Protein backbone atom coordinates (compact mmCIF):
# COMPACT_ATOMS: atom_id res chain seq x y z
CA UNK A 1 0.00 0.00 0.00
CA UNK A 2 2.91 2.34 0.72
CA UNK A 3 4.09 2.05 -2.89
CA UNK A 4 0.57 2.57 -4.25
CA UNK A 5 0.21 5.71 -2.12
CA UNK A 6 3.40 7.09 -3.67
CA UNK A 7 2.37 6.28 -7.25
CA UNK A 8 1.42 9.84 -8.24
CA UNK A 9 4.46 11.32 -6.51
CA UNK A 10 6.93 9.04 -8.27
CA UNK A 11 5.24 9.22 -11.66
CA UNK A 12 4.53 12.95 -11.43
CA UNK A 13 8.03 13.73 -10.15
CA UNK A 14 9.57 11.72 -12.99
CA UNK A 15 7.43 13.50 -15.62
CA UNK A 16 8.27 16.83 -13.98
CA UNK A 17 11.98 16.13 -14.38
CA UNK A 18 11.35 14.97 -17.96
CA UNK A 19 9.68 18.30 -18.83
CA UNK A 20 12.58 20.09 -17.17
CA UNK A 21 15.10 18.18 -19.28
CA UNK A 22 13.15 18.70 -22.51
CA UNK A 23 12.95 22.47 -22.05
CA UNK A 24 16.61 22.75 -21.05
CA UNK A 25 17.42 20.86 -24.26
CA UNK A 26 15.18 23.26 -26.19
CA UNK A 27 17.04 26.31 -24.87
CA UNK A 28 20.48 24.81 -25.47
CA UNK A 29 19.56 23.55 -28.92
CA UNK A 30 18.37 26.99 -30.01
CA UNK A 31 20.98 29.18 -28.31
CA UNK A 32 24.09 26.99 -28.46
CA UNK A 33 23.62 24.76 -31.50
CA UNK A 34 21.32 27.14 -33.45
CA UNK A 35 19.06 24.22 -34.30
CA UNK A 36 15.62 24.57 -32.64
CA UNK A 37 13.79 21.40 -31.65
CA UNK A 38 10.41 21.28 -33.39
CA UNK A 39 8.93 18.71 -31.02
CA UNK A 40 10.08 19.92 -27.59
CA UNK A 41 7.32 22.43 -26.87
CA UNK A 42 4.48 20.09 -27.86
CA UNK A 43 5.95 17.19 -25.89
CA UNK A 44 6.45 19.39 -22.82
CA UNK A 45 2.82 20.56 -23.02
CA UNK A 46 1.61 16.97 -23.40
CA UNK A 47 3.54 15.84 -20.32
CA UNK A 48 2.35 18.90 -18.39
CA UNK A 49 -1.25 17.80 -18.88
CA UNK A 50 -0.37 14.55 -17.10
CA UNK A 51 1.65 16.31 -14.39
CA UNK A 52 -1.24 18.69 -13.69
CA UNK A 53 -3.76 15.85 -13.53
CA UNK A 54 -1.51 13.79 -11.25
CA UNK A 55 -1.16 16.83 -9.02
CA UNK A 56 -4.96 17.07 -8.82
CA UNK A 57 -5.06 13.44 -7.69
CA UNK A 58 -2.48 14.10 -4.97
CA UNK A 59 -4.50 17.09 -3.75
CA UNK A 60 -7.66 14.94 -3.70
CA UNK A 61 -5.93 12.38 -1.49
CA UNK A 62 -4.55 15.03 0.84
CA UNK A 63 -7.76 17.12 0.62
CA UNK A 64 -5.73 20.22 -0.24
CA UNK A 65 -7.83 21.77 -3.00
CA UNK A 66 -8.75 25.39 -2.31
CA UNK A 67 -12.04 25.76 -0.45
CA UNK A 68 -13.81 28.38 1.63
CA UNK A 69 -14.51 27.37 5.22
CA UNK A 70 -15.61 30.74 6.57
CA UNK A 71 -19.28 29.72 6.97
CA UNK A 72 -18.69 26.10 7.97
CA UNK A 73 -16.42 27.20 10.82
CA UNK A 74 -19.39 29.09 12.26
CA UNK A 75 -21.69 26.04 12.13
CA UNK A 76 -22.47 23.74 15.09
CA UNK A 77 -20.50 20.50 14.94
CA UNK A 78 -23.36 18.26 13.77
CA UNK A 79 -24.42 20.65 11.00
CA UNK A 80 -20.79 21.02 9.94
CA UNK A 81 -20.46 17.24 9.74
CA UNK A 82 -23.64 16.98 7.67
CA UNK A 83 -22.47 19.78 5.38
CA UNK A 84 -19.08 18.13 4.92
CA UNK A 85 -20.81 14.86 4.01
CA UNK A 86 -22.85 16.67 1.36
CA UNK A 87 -19.68 18.34 0.05
CA UNK A 88 -17.94 14.97 -0.27
CA UNK A 89 -20.93 13.61 -2.21
CA UNK A 90 -20.63 16.46 -4.69
CA UNK A 91 -16.87 15.93 -5.08
CA UNK A 92 -17.53 12.22 -5.68
CA UNK A 93 -19.99 13.10 -8.45
CA UNK A 94 -17.47 15.52 -9.99
CA UNK A 95 -14.74 12.88 -10.14
CA UNK A 96 -17.12 10.36 -11.69
CA UNK A 97 -18.14 12.92 -14.32
CA UNK A 98 -14.46 13.60 -15.03
CA UNK A 99 -14.18 9.90 -15.87
CA UNK A 100 -17.42 9.90 -17.87
CA UNK A 101 -16.58 12.95 -19.99
CA UNK A 102 -12.97 11.89 -20.23
CA UNK A 103 -13.95 8.61 -21.88
CA UNK A 104 -16.25 10.42 -24.31
CA UNK A 105 -13.66 12.99 -25.36
CA UNK A 106 -11.02 10.26 -25.66
CA UNK A 107 -13.26 8.26 -28.00
CA UNK A 108 -14.02 11.33 -30.12
CA UNK A 109 -10.39 12.48 -30.42
CA UNK A 110 -8.87 11.79 -33.83
CA UNK A 111 -6.62 14.65 -34.94
CA UNK A 112 -2.86 14.07 -35.21
CA UNK A 113 -0.23 16.13 -33.40
CA UNK A 114 2.07 17.01 -36.30
CA UNK A 115 4.98 18.24 -34.17
CA UNK A 116 5.10 14.85 -32.43
CA UNK A 117 5.28 12.76 -35.57
CA UNK A 118 1.53 12.69 -36.15
CA UNK A 119 0.57 10.77 -33.00
CA UNK A 120 -3.11 10.99 -32.12
CA UNK A 121 -4.39 13.65 -29.76
CA UNK A 122 -5.92 10.73 -27.87
CA UNK A 123 -2.64 10.76 -25.94
CA UNK A 124 -3.62 14.14 -24.52
CA UNK A 125 -7.24 13.27 -23.77
CA UNK A 126 -6.32 9.93 -22.17
CA UNK A 127 -5.01 11.88 -19.18
CA UNK A 128 -8.52 12.86 -18.06
CA UNK A 129 -10.21 9.44 -17.72
CA UNK A 130 -7.10 7.50 -16.69
CA UNK A 131 -6.01 9.82 -13.91
CA UNK A 132 -9.61 10.56 -12.89
CA UNK A 133 -9.93 6.84 -12.09
CA UNK A 134 -6.89 7.24 -9.86
CA UNK A 135 -8.57 10.31 -8.33
CA UNK A 136 -11.60 8.17 -7.49
CA UNK A 137 -9.38 5.68 -5.69
CA UNK A 138 -7.69 8.52 -3.77
CA UNK A 139 -11.05 10.06 -2.93
CA UNK A 140 -12.27 6.80 -1.40
CA UNK A 141 -9.03 6.56 0.60
CA UNK A 142 -9.64 10.05 1.96
CA UNK A 143 -13.23 9.14 2.88
CA UNK A 144 -11.97 6.25 4.98
CA UNK A 145 -10.08 8.79 7.08
CA UNK A 146 -12.98 11.28 7.13
CA UNK A 147 -15.40 8.63 8.43
CA UNK A 148 -12.99 7.37 11.09
CA UNK A 149 -12.25 10.89 12.33
CA UNK A 150 -15.93 11.83 12.48
CA UNK A 151 -15.88 14.35 9.64
CA UNK A 152 -18.44 12.51 7.52
CA UNK A 153 -21.52 10.37 8.07
CA UNK A 154 -20.80 8.17 5.03
CA UNK A 155 -18.23 5.35 5.13
CA UNK A 156 -15.92 4.59 2.22
CA UNK A 157 -18.04 1.49 1.52
CA UNK A 158 -20.93 3.71 0.45
CA UNK A 159 -18.77 5.42 -2.17
CA UNK A 160 -17.33 2.10 -3.39
CA UNK A 161 -20.82 0.65 -3.95
CA UNK A 162 -22.01 3.88 -5.57
CA UNK A 163 -19.00 3.91 -7.90
CA UNK A 164 -19.64 0.31 -8.97
CA UNK A 165 -23.30 1.07 -9.72
CA UNK A 166 -22.47 4.25 -11.66
CA UNK A 167 -19.76 2.53 -13.71
CA UNK A 168 -22.17 -0.32 -14.51
CA UNK A 169 -24.72 2.20 -15.78
CA UNK A 170 -22.02 4.07 -17.71
CA UNK A 171 -20.86 0.99 -19.61
CA UNK A 172 -24.09 -1.00 -19.94
CA UNK A 173 -26.95 1.52 -19.89
CA UNK A 174 -25.51 5.00 -20.60
CA UNK A 175 -28.89 6.31 -21.81
CA UNK A 176 -30.08 6.26 -18.21
CA UNK A 177 -28.04 9.41 -17.58
CA UNK A 178 -30.37 11.32 -19.92
CA UNK A 179 -32.84 11.64 -17.05
CA UNK A 180 -30.47 14.21 -15.54
CA UNK A 181 -31.08 16.66 -18.37
CA UNK A 182 -33.32 19.26 -16.79
CA UNK A 183 -34.09 20.77 -20.20
CA UNK A 184 -36.10 17.61 -21.00
CA UNK A 185 -38.70 18.63 -18.43
CA UNK A 186 -38.66 22.40 -18.18
CA UNK A 187 -37.41 25.32 -20.27
CA UNK A 188 -35.73 27.92 -18.09
CA UNK A 189 -34.34 30.14 -20.84
CA UNK A 190 -32.13 33.06 -19.83
CA UNK A 191 -32.69 32.41 -16.12
CA UNK A 192 -30.56 29.24 -16.36
CA UNK A 193 -27.29 31.12 -16.01
CA UNK A 194 -28.52 32.97 -12.91
CA UNK A 195 -29.62 29.70 -11.30
CA UNK A 196 -26.23 28.18 -12.09
CA UNK A 197 -24.39 31.19 -10.63
CA UNK A 198 -26.53 31.10 -7.49
CA UNK A 199 -25.88 27.38 -7.01
CA UNK A 200 -22.17 27.98 -7.55
CA UNK A 201 -22.04 30.64 -4.83
CA UNK A 202 -24.03 28.51 -2.37
CA UNK A 203 -22.00 25.32 -2.76
CA UNK A 204 -18.70 27.23 -2.82
CA UNK A 205 -19.44 28.98 0.46
CA UNK A 206 -20.50 25.76 2.20
CA UNK A 207 -17.08 24.27 1.51
CA UNK A 208 -17.10 22.61 -1.92
CA UNK A 209 -13.58 23.19 -3.32
CA UNK A 210 -13.69 26.18 -5.64
CA UNK A 211 -12.61 24.18 -8.70
CA UNK A 212 -15.27 21.52 -8.23
CA UNK A 213 -17.96 24.13 -7.52
CA UNK A 214 -17.24 25.79 -10.88
CA UNK A 215 -17.50 22.42 -12.61
CA UNK A 216 -20.85 21.61 -10.96
CA UNK A 217 -22.36 25.02 -11.74
CA UNK A 218 -21.35 24.80 -15.40
CA UNK A 219 -22.73 21.29 -15.79
CA UNK A 220 -25.98 22.41 -14.16
CA UNK A 221 -26.20 25.22 -16.70
CA UNK A 222 -25.65 22.84 -19.62
CA UNK A 223 -28.24 20.42 -18.23
CA UNK A 224 -30.76 23.28 -18.24
CA UNK A 225 -29.89 24.56 -21.71
CA UNK A 226 -27.56 23.05 -24.31
CA UNK A 227 -26.51 19.55 -23.27
CA UNK A 228 -25.67 18.78 -26.90
CA UNK A 229 -22.61 21.06 -26.70
CA UNK A 230 -21.28 19.73 -23.40
CA UNK A 231 -18.92 17.33 -25.15
CA UNK A 232 -17.21 20.16 -27.02
CA UNK A 233 -17.09 22.21 -23.84
CA UNK A 234 -15.48 19.41 -21.83
CA UNK A 235 -12.62 19.22 -24.33
CA UNK A 236 -11.56 22.57 -22.88
CA UNK A 237 -10.91 20.88 -19.55
CA UNK A 238 -7.88 19.20 -21.08
CA UNK A 239 -6.92 21.85 -23.62
CA UNK A 240 -6.75 24.46 -20.85
CA UNK A 241 -3.59 22.74 -19.55
CA UNK A 242 -2.12 22.34 -23.04
CA UNK A 243 -0.52 25.77 -22.77
CA UNK A 244 3.15 26.67 -23.04
CA UNK A 245 2.99 29.90 -20.93
CA UNK A 246 1.43 27.93 -18.05
CA UNK A 247 4.55 25.76 -17.90
CA UNK A 248 6.24 28.68 -16.13
CA UNK A 249 3.99 28.25 -13.08
CA UNK A 250 5.26 24.87 -11.79
CA UNK A 251 8.89 25.80 -12.39
CA UNK A 252 8.66 29.09 -10.51
CA UNK A 253 7.01 27.09 -7.72
CA UNK A 254 9.96 24.68 -7.91
CA UNK A 255 12.41 27.60 -7.81
CA UNK A 256 10.84 28.88 -4.59
CA UNK A 257 11.08 25.42 -3.01
CA UNK A 258 14.72 25.03 -4.10
CA UNK A 259 15.55 28.42 -2.59
CA UNK A 260 14.52 27.01 0.78
CA UNK A 261 16.06 23.55 0.47
CA UNK A 262 19.30 24.75 -1.15
CA UNK A 263 20.32 27.18 1.59
CA UNK A 264 19.65 30.25 -0.54
CA UNK A 265 17.02 31.97 1.62
CA UNK A 266 19.30 32.03 4.66
CA UNK A 267 22.08 33.75 2.70
CA UNK A 268 19.64 36.31 1.27
CA UNK A 269 18.46 37.11 4.79
CA UNK A 270 22.00 37.49 6.12
CA UNK A 271 22.90 39.89 3.30
CA UNK A 272 19.79 42.00 3.98
CA UNK A 273 20.70 42.02 7.68
CA UNK A 274 24.21 43.30 7.00
CA UNK A 275 22.76 46.11 4.85
CA UNK A 276 19.79 47.25 6.94
CA UNK A 277 20.04 45.84 10.45
CA UNK A 278 21.70 48.89 12.04
CA UNK A 279 18.92 51.35 11.14
CA UNK A 280 15.97 52.18 13.42
CA UNK A 281 13.58 49.25 13.02
CA UNK A 282 16.51 47.36 11.54
CA UNK A 283 15.26 43.77 11.77
CA UNK A 284 11.91 44.86 10.34
CA UNK A 285 13.73 46.50 7.43
CA UNK A 286 15.75 43.30 7.03
CA UNK A 287 12.52 41.32 6.86
CA UNK A 288 11.09 43.60 4.17
CA UNK A 289 14.35 43.85 2.22
CA UNK A 290 14.83 40.08 2.23
CA UNK A 291 11.30 39.69 0.87
CA UNK A 292 12.15 42.06 -1.98
CA UNK A 293 15.25 40.03 -2.84
CA UNK A 294 13.44 36.69 -2.50
CA UNK A 295 10.53 37.94 -4.61
CA UNK A 296 12.89 38.32 -7.54
CA UNK A 297 13.40 34.57 -7.48
CA UNK A 298 10.22 32.76 -6.45
CA UNK A 299 7.37 34.99 -7.68
CA UNK A 300 5.06 33.77 -4.92
CA UNK A 301 3.75 35.51 -1.80
CA UNK A 302 3.13 32.34 0.20
CA UNK A 303 6.54 30.91 -0.82
CA UNK A 304 8.06 34.03 0.76
CA UNK A 305 5.91 33.76 3.89
CA UNK A 306 6.61 30.06 4.30
CA UNK A 307 10.24 30.06 3.16
CA UNK A 308 11.72 33.17 4.76
CA UNK A 309 9.04 33.52 7.43
CA UNK A 310 10.44 31.17 10.06
CA UNK A 311 13.94 32.62 9.71
CA UNK A 312 12.70 36.22 9.81
CA UNK A 313 10.42 35.77 12.82
CA UNK A 314 13.12 34.03 14.86
CA UNK A 315 15.63 36.80 14.13
CA UNK A 316 13.12 39.52 15.04
CA UNK A 317 12.17 37.77 18.28
CA UNK A 318 15.83 37.43 19.22
CA UNK A 319 16.21 41.17 18.60
CA UNK A 320 13.38 41.95 21.05
CA UNK A 321 10.46 42.56 18.69
CA UNK A 322 6.91 41.76 19.83
CA UNK A 323 5.16 38.79 18.22
CA UNK A 324 2.44 40.89 16.59
CA UNK A 325 5.01 43.02 14.73
CA UNK A 326 7.10 39.96 13.84
CA UNK A 327 4.06 38.32 12.26
CA UNK A 328 2.63 41.52 10.80
CA UNK A 329 5.78 42.56 8.94
CA UNK A 330 6.39 39.01 7.69
CA UNK A 331 2.86 38.74 6.32
CA UNK A 332 2.74 42.25 4.83
CA UNK A 333 6.13 42.01 3.13
CA UNK A 334 5.30 38.72 1.42
CA UNK A 335 2.93 40.50 -0.98
CA UNK A 336 5.94 42.09 -2.69
CA UNK A 337 6.59 38.70 -4.34
CA UNK A 338 3.74 38.68 -6.87
CA UNK A 339 4.59 42.23 -7.99
CA UNK A 340 8.35 42.10 -8.51
CA UNK A 341 9.35 39.91 -11.46
CA UNK A 342 9.14 37.00 -11.86
CA UNK A 343 5.53 36.63 -10.72
CA UNK A 344 3.26 33.60 -10.90
CA UNK A 345 0.20 35.86 -10.53
CA UNK A 346 1.34 37.96 -13.51
CA UNK A 347 1.84 34.84 -15.62
CA UNK A 348 -1.70 33.67 -14.88
CA UNK A 349 -3.07 37.15 -15.64
CA UNK A 350 -1.09 37.25 -18.89
CA UNK A 351 -2.59 33.92 -19.96
CA UNK A 352 -6.14 34.99 -19.08
CA UNK A 353 -5.84 38.46 -20.66
CA UNK A 354 -3.61 37.35 -23.54
CA UNK A 355 -1.12 40.10 -22.65
CA UNK A 356 2.68 40.21 -22.81
CA UNK A 357 4.10 38.50 -19.73
CA UNK A 358 7.40 40.33 -20.26
CA UNK A 359 5.63 43.73 -20.06
CA UNK A 360 3.73 42.60 -16.97
CA UNK A 361 6.99 41.59 -15.32
CA UNK A 362 8.48 45.05 -15.92
CA UNK A 363 5.28 46.84 -14.92
CA UNK A 364 5.23 45.27 -11.47
CA UNK A 365 8.73 46.39 -10.48
CA UNK A 366 8.02 50.05 -9.59
CA UNK A 367 4.88 49.25 -7.50
CA UNK A 368 6.88 46.51 -5.76
CA UNK A 369 9.61 48.98 -4.81
CA UNK A 370 7.00 51.55 -3.72
CA UNK A 371 5.38 49.04 -1.37
CA UNK A 372 8.81 48.07 -0.03
CA UNK A 373 9.59 51.71 0.83
CA UNK A 374 6.10 52.32 2.23
CA UNK A 375 6.32 49.27 4.51
CA UNK A 376 9.77 50.37 5.68
CA UNK A 377 8.38 53.82 6.53
CA UNK A 378 5.62 52.29 8.66
CA UNK A 379 8.12 49.91 10.27
CA UNK A 380 10.38 52.87 11.14
CA UNK A 381 7.46 54.68 12.79
CA UNK A 382 6.44 51.64 14.86
CA UNK A 383 10.03 50.83 15.86
CA UNK A 384 10.57 54.43 16.96
CA UNK A 385 7.37 54.40 19.00
CA UNK A 386 8.06 51.05 20.69
CA UNK A 387 11.78 51.62 21.12
CA UNK A 388 13.00 48.50 19.36
CA UNK A 389 16.79 48.09 19.42
CA UNK A 390 19.11 48.30 16.42
CA UNK A 391 21.68 45.64 15.65
CA UNK A 392 25.35 46.65 15.48
CA UNK A 393 26.41 48.01 12.12
CA UNK A 394 28.11 45.38 9.99
CA UNK A 395 31.79 45.92 9.40
CA UNK A 396 33.11 46.21 5.88
CA UNK A 397 34.45 42.66 6.17
CA UNK A 398 31.06 41.32 7.35
CA UNK A 399 29.26 43.18 4.57
CA UNK A 400 31.64 41.84 1.93
CA UNK A 401 31.38 38.32 3.36
CA UNK A 402 27.56 38.29 3.35
CA UNK A 403 27.51 39.76 -0.15
CA UNK A 404 29.97 37.14 -1.36
CA UNK A 405 27.87 34.32 0.12
CA UNK A 406 24.64 35.64 -1.38
CA UNK A 407 26.09 36.89 -4.68
CA UNK A 408 25.02 33.90 -6.76
CA UNK A 409 21.51 34.01 -5.31
CA UNK A 410 21.14 37.75 -5.97
CA UNK A 411 22.03 37.17 -9.62
CA UNK A 412 18.83 35.15 -10.14
CA UNK A 413 16.41 38.04 -10.90
CA UNK A 414 19.02 39.70 -13.13
CA UNK A 415 19.43 36.43 -15.01
CA UNK A 416 15.66 36.07 -15.47
CA UNK A 417 14.91 39.63 -16.58
CA UNK A 418 18.11 39.99 -18.59
CA UNK A 419 17.47 36.73 -20.41
CA UNK A 420 13.92 37.73 -21.33
CA UNK A 421 14.87 41.16 -22.69
CA UNK A 422 17.95 39.95 -24.51
CA UNK A 423 15.83 37.37 -26.31
CA UNK A 424 17.84 34.44 -24.94
CA UNK A 425 14.68 32.82 -23.63
CA UNK A 426 10.94 33.40 -23.31
CA UNK A 427 9.17 34.17 -19.99
CA UNK A 428 8.22 30.48 -19.79
CA UNK A 429 11.79 29.38 -20.41
CA UNK A 430 12.96 31.88 -17.78
CA UNK A 431 11.24 29.74 -15.15
CA UNK A 432 13.21 26.71 -16.38
CA UNK A 433 16.45 28.70 -16.27
CA UNK A 434 15.66 29.98 -12.76
CA UNK A 435 15.03 26.43 -11.51
CA UNK A 436 18.18 25.12 -13.22
CA UNK A 437 20.23 27.96 -11.76
CA UNK A 438 18.82 27.26 -8.28
CA UNK A 439 19.83 23.61 -8.62
CA UNK A 440 23.36 24.55 -9.68
CA UNK A 441 24.04 26.99 -6.83
CA UNK A 442 22.24 24.81 -4.26
CA UNK A 443 24.12 21.66 -5.29
CA UNK A 444 27.55 22.86 -6.43
CA UNK A 445 28.07 26.28 -4.82
CA UNK A 446 26.36 26.04 -1.43
CA UNK A 447 26.41 22.20 -1.45
CA UNK A 448 23.20 21.86 0.56
CA UNK A 449 20.96 20.35 -2.13
CA UNK A 450 20.98 16.55 -2.50
CA UNK A 451 19.52 14.52 -5.35
CA UNK A 452 16.89 13.09 -2.99
CA UNK A 453 15.91 16.60 -1.89
CA UNK A 454 15.75 17.70 -5.52
CA UNK A 455 13.38 14.87 -6.44
CA UNK A 456 11.22 15.54 -3.38
CA UNK A 457 11.14 19.24 -4.34
CA UNK A 458 9.87 18.28 -7.81
CA UNK A 459 7.15 16.16 -6.18
CA UNK A 460 6.13 19.04 -3.91
CA UNK A 461 6.01 21.43 -6.87
CA UNK A 462 3.90 18.92 -8.80
CA UNK A 463 1.42 18.62 -5.92
CA UNK A 464 1.05 22.42 -5.62
CA UNK A 465 0.65 22.61 -9.40
CA UNK A 466 -2.29 20.20 -9.12
CA UNK A 467 -4.23 22.73 -7.04
CA UNK A 468 -3.63 25.37 -9.72
CA UNK A 469 -4.41 22.89 -12.52
CA UNK A 470 -7.92 22.09 -11.24
CA UNK A 471 -8.67 25.80 -11.04
CA UNK A 472 -7.41 26.37 -14.58
CA UNK A 473 -9.43 23.46 -16.00
CA UNK A 474 -12.73 24.24 -14.35
CA UNK A 475 -12.57 28.02 -14.71
CA UNK A 476 -12.02 27.50 -18.46
CA UNK A 477 -15.09 25.24 -18.46
CA UNK A 478 -16.97 27.85 -16.43
CA UNK A 479 -15.80 30.52 -18.86
CA UNK A 480 -17.61 28.73 -21.67
CA UNK A 481 -20.90 29.35 -19.84
CA UNK A 482 -19.94 32.97 -19.14
CA UNK A 483 -19.13 33.52 -22.82
CA UNK A 484 -22.29 31.83 -24.14
CA UNK A 485 -24.53 33.90 -21.89
CA UNK A 486 -22.46 37.10 -22.32
CA UNK A 487 -22.31 37.52 -18.56
CA UNK A 488 -19.21 39.71 -18.78
CA UNK A 489 -21.00 42.08 -21.14
CA UNK A 490 -24.03 42.23 -18.85
CA UNK A 491 -21.80 43.12 -15.90
CA UNK A 492 -20.04 45.69 -18.09
CA UNK A 493 -23.41 47.26 -18.92
CA UNK A 494 -24.06 47.70 -15.19
CA UNK A 495 -20.70 49.42 -14.76
CA UNK A 496 -21.41 51.65 -17.77
CA UNK A 497 -24.78 52.62 -16.32
CA UNK A 498 -23.28 53.55 -12.94
CA UNK A 499 -19.80 54.86 -13.82
CA UNK A 500 -19.05 58.00 -15.81
CA UNK A 501 -15.26 57.68 -16.12
CA UNK A 502 -12.47 55.06 -16.11
CA UNK A 503 -11.39 56.22 -12.64
CA UNK A 504 -14.87 55.57 -11.26
CA UNK A 505 -14.78 52.08 -12.77
CA UNK A 506 -11.37 51.42 -11.21
CA UNK A 507 -12.62 52.56 -7.80
CA UNK A 508 -15.63 50.24 -8.12
CA UNK A 509 -13.44 47.31 -9.19
CA UNK A 510 -11.01 47.96 -6.33
CA UNK A 511 -13.88 48.01 -3.84
CA UNK A 512 -15.30 44.79 -5.27
CA UNK A 513 -11.95 42.98 -5.17
CA UNK A 514 -11.14 44.20 -1.66
CA UNK A 515 -14.47 42.85 -0.45
CA UNK A 516 -14.22 39.51 -2.27
CA UNK A 517 -10.60 39.12 -1.19
CA UNK A 518 -11.75 38.90 2.42
CA UNK A 519 -13.56 35.65 1.68
CA UNK A 520 -12.03 34.08 -1.44
CA UNK A 521 -8.49 32.80 -1.91
CA UNK A 522 -6.36 35.05 -4.17
CA UNK A 523 -5.72 32.30 -6.72
CA UNK A 524 -9.41 31.42 -6.90
CA UNK A 525 -10.38 35.09 -7.12
CA UNK A 526 -7.99 35.64 -10.00
CA UNK A 527 -9.55 32.87 -12.04
CA UNK A 528 -13.12 33.72 -11.07
CA UNK A 529 -13.36 37.45 -11.66
CA UNK A 530 -10.71 38.40 -14.22
CA UNK A 531 -12.58 36.87 -17.18
CA UNK A 532 -15.49 39.17 -16.29
CA UNK A 533 -13.48 42.27 -15.33
CA UNK A 534 -11.07 42.36 -18.27
CA UNK A 535 -13.84 43.06 -20.85
CA UNK A 536 -15.02 45.92 -18.61
CA UNK A 537 -11.50 47.38 -18.57
CA UNK A 538 -11.32 47.09 -22.35
CA UNK A 539 -14.67 48.82 -22.77
CA UNK A 540 -13.38 51.80 -20.78
CA UNK A 541 -10.03 51.81 -22.64
CA UNK A 542 -8.09 50.96 -19.49
CA UNK A 543 -4.55 49.75 -20.19
CA UNK A 544 -4.56 45.99 -19.54
CA UNK A 545 -0.93 45.95 -18.35
CA UNK A 546 -1.79 48.54 -15.71
CA UNK A 547 -5.01 46.66 -14.93
CA UNK A 548 -3.07 43.45 -14.36
CA UNK A 549 -0.74 45.04 -11.82
CA UNK A 550 -3.56 46.87 -10.04
CA UNK A 551 -5.73 43.76 -9.70
CA UNK A 552 -2.73 41.68 -8.61
CA UNK A 553 -1.94 44.13 -5.80
CA UNK A 554 -5.60 44.18 -4.83
CA UNK A 555 -5.76 40.40 -4.62
CA UNK A 556 -2.56 40.33 -2.58
CA UNK A 557 -4.24 42.61 -0.05
CA UNK A 558 -6.84 39.86 0.18
CA UNK A 559 -4.30 37.37 1.55
CA UNK A 560 -3.68 39.82 4.42
CA UNK A 561 -7.32 40.41 5.39
CA UNK A 562 -9.37 38.09 7.61
CA UNK A 563 -11.22 35.81 7.62
CA UNK A 564 -9.61 34.13 4.56
CA UNK A 565 -6.18 35.80 4.54
CA UNK A 566 -3.94 32.86 3.66
CA UNK A 567 -0.72 34.73 4.52
CA UNK A 568 -2.03 35.18 8.07
CA UNK A 569 -2.43 31.42 8.48
CA UNK A 570 0.94 30.59 6.90
CA UNK A 571 2.82 33.10 9.06
CA UNK A 572 0.96 31.96 12.19
CA UNK A 573 1.98 28.36 11.45
CA UNK A 574 5.67 29.00 10.72
CA UNK A 575 5.94 31.52 13.57
CA UNK A 576 4.10 29.34 16.11
CA UNK A 577 1.70 32.15 17.03
CA UNK A 578 -2.05 32.72 16.84
CA UNK A 579 -3.77 34.06 13.74
CA UNK A 580 -5.23 36.88 15.84
CA UNK A 581 -1.71 37.96 16.81
CA UNK A 582 -0.62 38.10 13.17
CA UNK A 583 -3.83 39.93 12.23
CA UNK A 584 -3.25 42.55 14.93
CA UNK A 585 0.29 43.08 13.70
CA UNK A 586 -0.57 43.34 10.01
CA UNK A 587 -3.26 46.03 10.42
CA UNK A 588 -0.93 49.08 10.57
CA UNK A 589 0.98 47.79 7.54
CA UNK A 590 -2.20 47.69 5.49
CA UNK A 591 -2.22 51.51 5.57
CA UNK A 592 0.88 51.99 3.35
CA UNK A 593 -0.30 49.19 1.08
CA UNK A 594 -3.68 50.91 0.61
CA UNK A 595 -1.93 54.23 -0.03
CA UNK A 596 0.14 52.57 -2.77
CA UNK A 597 -3.01 51.08 -4.30
CA UNK A 598 -4.67 54.51 -4.35
CA UNK A 599 -1.58 56.10 -5.93
CA UNK A 600 -1.31 53.62 -8.79
CA UNK A 601 -5.08 53.77 -9.38
CA UNK A 602 -5.05 57.57 -9.72
CA UNK A 603 -1.72 57.69 -11.57
CA UNK A 604 -1.51 54.58 -13.79
CA UNK A 605 1.60 56.05 -15.46
CA UNK A 606 3.54 54.83 -12.41
CA UNK A 607 2.98 51.35 -13.80
CA UNK A 608 2.87 51.88 -17.55
CA UNK A 609 5.77 54.31 -18.10
CA UNK A 610 8.67 51.85 -17.85
CA UNK A 611 7.15 48.93 -19.83
CA UNK A 612 5.97 51.27 -22.59
CA UNK A 613 9.44 52.78 -22.73
CA UNK A 614 11.25 49.43 -22.93
CA UNK A 615 8.70 47.49 -25.00
CA UNK A 616 6.77 49.94 -27.26
Swiss-Prot record:
Main localization of the protein described in the UniProt heading: membrane
Quaternary organization: The complex comprises the extracytoplasmic solute receptor protein SiaP, and the fused transmembrane protein SiaT.
Region (TRAP transporter small permease) residue spans: 1-190
Transmembrane segments annotated in the record for this chain: 9-29, 36-56, 83-103, 117-137, 153-173, 195-215, 244-264, 288-308, 332-352, 357-377, 407-427, 431-451, 459-479, 505-525, 527-547, 552-572, 587-607
Name the record gives this protein: Sialic acid TRAP transporter permease protein SiaT
Free-text function comment from the UniProt entry: Part of the tripartite ATP-independent periplasmic (TRAP) transport system SiaPT involved in the uptake of sialic acid.
Localization of this protein: Cell inner membrane
Stated family: In the N-terminal section; belongs to the TRAP transporter small permease family.
Alphabetic keyword roster: Cell inner membrane, Cell membrane, Membrane, Sugar transport, Transmembrane, Transmembrane helix, Transport
Gene name linked to the record: siaT
InterPro entries in UniProt: DctM, DctQ, TRAP_DctM
UniProt source species: Haemophilus influenzae (strain 86-028NP)
GO CC annotations on file: plasma membrane
UniProt GO molecular function: transmembrane transporter activity
Region (TRAP transporter large permease): 191-616
Pfam family, one: DctM
Membrane topology recorded in Swiss-Prot or TrEMBL: Multi-pass membrane protein
Amino acid sequence: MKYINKLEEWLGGTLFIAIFGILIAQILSRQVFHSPLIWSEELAKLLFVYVGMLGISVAVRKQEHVFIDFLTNLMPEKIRKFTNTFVQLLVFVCIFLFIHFGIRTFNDASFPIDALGGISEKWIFAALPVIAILMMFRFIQAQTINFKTGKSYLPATFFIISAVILFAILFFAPDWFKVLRISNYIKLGSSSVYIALLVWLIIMFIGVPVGWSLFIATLLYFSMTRWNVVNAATEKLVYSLDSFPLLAVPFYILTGILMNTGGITERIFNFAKSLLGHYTGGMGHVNIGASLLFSGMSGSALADAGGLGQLEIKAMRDAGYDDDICGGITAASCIIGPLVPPSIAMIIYGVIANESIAKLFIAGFIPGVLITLALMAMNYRIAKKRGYPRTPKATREQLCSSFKQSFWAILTPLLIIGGIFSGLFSPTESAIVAAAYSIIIGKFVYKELTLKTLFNSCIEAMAITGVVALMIMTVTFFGDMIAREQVAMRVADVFVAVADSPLTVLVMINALLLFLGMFIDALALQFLVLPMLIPIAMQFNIDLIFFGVMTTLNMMIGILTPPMGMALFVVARVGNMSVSTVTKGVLPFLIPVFVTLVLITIFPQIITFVPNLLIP
